[in-house]
From Swiss-Prot:
EC nos: 1.3.7.7
A GO biological process held by the record: photosynthesis, dark reaction
Enzyme class, spelled out: oxidoreductase
PANTHER family documented for this protein: LIGHT-INDEPENDENT PROTOCHLOROPHYLLIDE REDUCTASE IRON-SULFUR ATP-BINDING PROTEIN
Entry's Gene Ontology molecular function annotations: 4 iron, 4 sulfur cluster binding; ATP binding; metal ion binding; oxidoreductase activity, acting on iron-sulfur proteins as donors; oxidoreductase activity, acting on the CH-CH group of donors, iron-sulfur protein as acceptor
Superkingdom as given in the UniProt entry: Bacteria
Species name: Prochlorococcus marinus subsp. pastoris (strain CCMP1986 / NIES-2087 / MED4)
Entry protein name: Light-independent protochlorophyllide reductase iron-sulfur ATP-binding protein
Reactions catalysed: chlorophyllide a + oxidized 2[4Fe-4S]-[ferredoxin] + 2 ADP + 2 phosphate = protochlorophyllide a + reduced 2[4Fe-4S]-[ferredoxin] + 2 ATP + 2 H2O
Length: 295
């Protein structure tokens, strides 16, 4: 006896992650999803980029999509409650919530939301992200927003954590100049290209982080058609800003700090200028293995 399993269309295969067409972020807002290997500095990058957009006069919303809910603490200077925790308190009757229950104002007016997630080993993080966007729309909190940044958990590219790609205009990939980070970046490129067939998301570019040099990133970019949009060296002030629970824009303006601030402002300006989307071509695993490293 044989049976045939049909390949599900994008967004199908899980009731939890199929996007409700009514839960779209309004046209006009610049929506960016930030991905990268776990621990590479996505939250630091997202928060400082949000701060940079706000410095340019934009109304910014940052949505943390990690159960650790630590995406926005450098903006708010505290750990804020998550959407999933707040919804549980009202037995998921969202009509009982006020915006101040789950949205918090951070540095320079950046609005912050932590979607949170289900307990480890249960549920779907993508479902939580979808519910967060739905809640924001129900309360009309996206209507006057210029920029939305999704800070996404690790390099997981399953249907659930690929959910922010369904809302985004661009994806930025944060990487270091090492094999593991670039290997993860390649998987993310594959996921974005798959989503781009049915959604508006496109590759915006690469953010080189915690790296003095970019030679390995450059090799990968040259082979795949990607482009480095910003380069943040391993500056100790960035590490200290996390310990101080603040953005790089709140640090003492030393030469290193000002250089980092200007790089974030430049990245924000470039993204606002309708950056040319990239048509990246992911490599096979063996190709990356052979490409990277030294002769």
């Amino acid at each position: 006896m044989t049976s045939t399993i049909n390949k599900p269309l994008d967004g199908e295969g899980s009731v939890q992650v199929k996007q409700d067409p009514k839960v779209n972020i309004e046209e006009g807002a610049l929506v960016i999803a930030v991905y990268g290997k776990g621990g590479i500095g996505k939250s630091t990058t997202s928060s400082n980029l949000s701060a940079a957009f706000s410095k340019l006069g934009k109304k910014v919303l940052q949505i943390g999509c990690d159960p650790k809910h630590d995406s926005t603490f450098t903006l708010t200077h505290k750990m804020v409650p998550t959407v999933i925790d707040i919804l549980e308190e009202v037995d998921f009757h969202s009509e009982e919530l006020r915006p101040t229950d789950f949205m918090f104002e951070g540095f320079n007016g950046v609005m912050c939301v932590e979607s949170g997630g289900p307990p480890a080993g249960t549920g779907c993080g993508g479902y939580v992200t979808g519910q967060t966007v739905k809640l924001l729309k129900e309360h009309h909190l996206l209507e006057d927003t210029d920029v939305v940044i999704f800070d996404v958990l690790g390099d997981v590219v399953c249907g659930g954590f690929a959910a922010p790609l369904q809302h985004a205009n661009y994806c930025l990939i944060v990487t270091a100049n090492d094999f593991d980070s670039i290997f993860a970046m390649n998987r993310i490129v594959s996921a974005i290209q798959a989503k781009a067939k049915n959604y508006k998301v496109r590759l915006g570019g690469v953010v080189a982080n915690r790296s003095k040099d970019t030679d390995q990133i450059d090799k990968f970019n040259n082979r795949t058609g990607l482009k480095t949009m910003a380069h943040f060296k391993d500056v100790d002030a960035i590490r200290r800003s996390r310990l101080k629970k603040c953005t790089i824009f709140e640090m003492e303006p030393t030469e290193d700090v000002v250089e980092v601030q200007n790089e974030y402002l430049s990245l924000a300006k470039n993204m606002l200028d309708n950056v040319e989307p990239l048509e990246g071509t992911p490599l096979k695993d063996r190709e990356i293995f052979d490409l990277l490293g030294f002769d």
